[in-house]
């Protein structure tokens, strides 16, 4: 047995326990850090070749591992911009250097420019979004991503572009009978305009629909739309839409505001043995309204919310994942970058594939268990002391060997 080998083994053990104490200290320090993932020290033996009749003590080496795939507890808050992921995936954030990173730390707040940034200063990334149209995702990269910005637009108005109007037309009405209903629409400045829908019976199972701007008296459908019905009173006209081209026909008021082209869906129109009855219709657009806040749903769609109750979709938050999350490379600020063994980064949306759902008004706590860390600290302290005794014993034996010549 080599005395120097014994001492080296003791030093190896002390270094290993020192590394373990370092991870324990880091875990305890970050126990309250949002989205922090516990670090642990794994030990493996080092074996040295031995000769006949002798044994060379080896040592121990350590490797730090991170429990990145282990989800922490969810705590709920009153801020809509606090986000947590219930399931797999990471938020994609941008650092001050313009580099994209992954994180589970979702304590986002708007900065002075309206960008959503977390406590470490990283900016949340997503895709610009239009209602009903999913953005095109580059599944293995970050191309097309933009900063999620909630800067207030102040007062905002939207002109009407599409709507619907359904009605039952009385089958027993005489030819020439006219039934009228109306629909409020919005011009380009959010002013309300009234469109009258005039239904005139022209023959058996046949009617015409004329849409008229009430203020000017001008028809927006030239010529009137012909409506035809079968014996069951079902509409057979195809397509069951009409474009009320107000931009060309309605004279603009003194403000210069105009009613643009509005596509009206009349597919719910019927002809039955019942009195004229309109379904009330629907229209998009809105009058001027102030921003009242924002809302983020479980699919990651970010809406600006106005005082009139209108929700305007602006962004869809992107998520990313890898095949081996525990092999991601930790960076300062509680973020991660792609590691050598983590696998390629896959980009997608919450609620699809292996991605979890986004919880608004919630944060993911660290996955550190203080009781376990304190236990590990005591174990490491005792093991460090034991390894120091090995070193001390080897030193004392070496001193005995040196004193033999005296």
UniProtKB/Swiss-Prot annotation:
Which InterPro entries does the record cross-reference, listed alphabetically? Falgellar_hook_FlgE_sf (IPR037058), Flag_bb_rod_N (IPR001444), Flagellar_basal_body_rod_CS (IPR019776), Flagellar_FlgE/F/G (IPR020013), Flg_bb/hook_C_dom (IPR010930), FlgE/F/G-like (IPR037925), FlgE_D2 (IPR011491), LlgE_F_G-like_D1 (IPR053967)
Q: Which keywords does UniProt give here? A: Bacterial flagellum
Taking the record's annotation, the residue ranges forming a coiled coil are none
Report whether Flavoprotein shows up as a keyword of the record: no
Principal location listed in the UniProt entry: other
Q: Where, subcellularly, is it found?
A: Bacterial flagellum basal body
Q: Which GO terms describe its cellular component?
A: bacterial-type flagellum basal body; bacterial-type flagellum hook; cytosol
GO biological processes: bacterial-type flagellum-dependent swarming motility
Q: In which family does this protein belong, per the annotation?
A: Belongs to the flagella basal body rod proteins family.
NCBIfam families, A to Z: FlgEFG_subfam
What is the official name of this protein in its record?
Flagellar hook protein FlgE
State the taxonomy lineage: Bacteria, Pseudomonadati, Pseudomonadota, Alphaproteobacteria, Hyphomicrobiales
């Amino acid at each position: 047995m080599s005395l120097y080998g014994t001492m080296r083994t003791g030093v190896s053990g002390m270094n290993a326990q020192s590394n373990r104490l370092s991870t324990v200290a880091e875990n305890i320090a970050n126990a309250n850090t949002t989205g922090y993932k516990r670090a642990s020290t794994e030990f493996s033996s080092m074996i040295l070749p031995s000769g006949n009749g002798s044994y060379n003590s080896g040592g121990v080496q350590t490797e730090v591992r991170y429990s990145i795939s282990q989800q922490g507890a969810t705590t709920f808050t009153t801020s809509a911009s606090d986000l947590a992921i219930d399931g797999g995936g990471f938020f994609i954030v941008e650092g001050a250097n313009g580099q994209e990173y992954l994180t589970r730390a979702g304590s986002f707040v708007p900065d002075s420019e309206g960008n959503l940034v977390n406590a470490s200063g990283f900016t949340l990334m997503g895709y610009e979004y239009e209602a009903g149209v999913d953005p095109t995702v580059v599944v293995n990269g970050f191309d097309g991503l933009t900063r999620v910005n909630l800067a207030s637009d102040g007062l905002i108005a939207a002109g009407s572009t599409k709507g619907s109007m359904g009605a039952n037309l009385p089958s027993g009405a005489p030819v020439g009978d006219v039934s009228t209903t109306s629909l409020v629409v919005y011009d380009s400045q959010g002013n309300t305009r009234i469109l009258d829908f005039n239904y005139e019976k022209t023959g058996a199972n046949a009617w015409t629909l004329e849409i008229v701007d009430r203020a000017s008296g001008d028809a927006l459908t030239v010529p009137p739309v012909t409506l035809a019905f079968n014996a069951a009173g079902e509409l057979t006209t195809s397509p069951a839409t009409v474009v009320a081209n107000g931009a060309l026909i309605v004279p603009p008021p003194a403000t210069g505001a105009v009613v643009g082209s509005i596509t009206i869906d009349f597919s719910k129109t019927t002809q039955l043995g019942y009195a004229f009855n309109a379904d009330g219709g629907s229209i998009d657009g809105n009058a001027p309204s102030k921003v009242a806040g924002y809302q983020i749903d479980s699919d990651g769609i970010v809406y600006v919310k106005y005082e009139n109750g209108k929700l305007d979709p602006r962004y869809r938050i992107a998520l990313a994942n890898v095949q081996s999350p525990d092999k991601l490379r930790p960076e300062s600020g509680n973020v991660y970058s792609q590691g050598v063994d983590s696998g390629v980064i896959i980009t997608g949306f919450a609620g699809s594939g292996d991605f979890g759902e986004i919880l608004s008004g919630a944060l993911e706590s660290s996955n550190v268990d203080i009781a376990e860390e304190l236990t590990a600290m005591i174990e490491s302290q005792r093991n460090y002391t034991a390894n120091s005794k090995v070193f001390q014993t080897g030193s004392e034996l070496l001193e005995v060997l040196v004193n033999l010549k005296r």
